[in-house]
Amino acid sequence: MLEKTTRMNYLFDFYQSLLTQKQRSYMSLYYLDDLSLGEIAEEFDVSRQAVYDNIKRTEAMLEEYEEKLVLLQKFQERQRLVAKLKQLISEEEHVNEEMKQVVEAIEKLD
């Protein structure tokens, strides 16, 4: 569950501008503020089921956006490559060819 929450938070960060205000509000309250479905329903004066349905549809939309735009995947790959590059730089013996390959891989992501 924590892994899903983390993923949804990342997807929300990347794609929230593509969502409606209501979708942003529900997702923010549910995932960022950790409110329950019932608490969100009470705040918006709708049923718990309406909140649940909206959040599930929004989650599916975020996954669809990621499938098409792969912003999160590229971000994670960049993070991995930057960490590897930092490790290589910090080592006593610099492996120039390997560092060049990492830099090229980062450049290809953008």
UniProtKB/Swiss-Prot annotation:
Might take part in the signal recognition particle (SRP) pathway. This is inferred from the conservation of its genetic proximity to ftsY/ffh. May be a regulatory protein. SUPFAM superfamilies: Sigma3 and sigma4 domains of RNA polymerase sigma factors. It comes from Bacillus cereus (strain ATCC 14579 / DSM 31 / CCUG 7414 / JCM 2152 / NBRC 15305 / NCIMB 9373 / NCTC 2599 / NRRL B-3711). Disulfide bonds: none annotated. This is UPF0122 protein BC_3844. Belongs to the UPF0122 family. It holds the Pfam family UPF0122. InterPro entries: RNA_pol_sigma_r3/r4-like, UPF0122, UPF0122_fam_protein, WH-like_DNA-bd_sf.
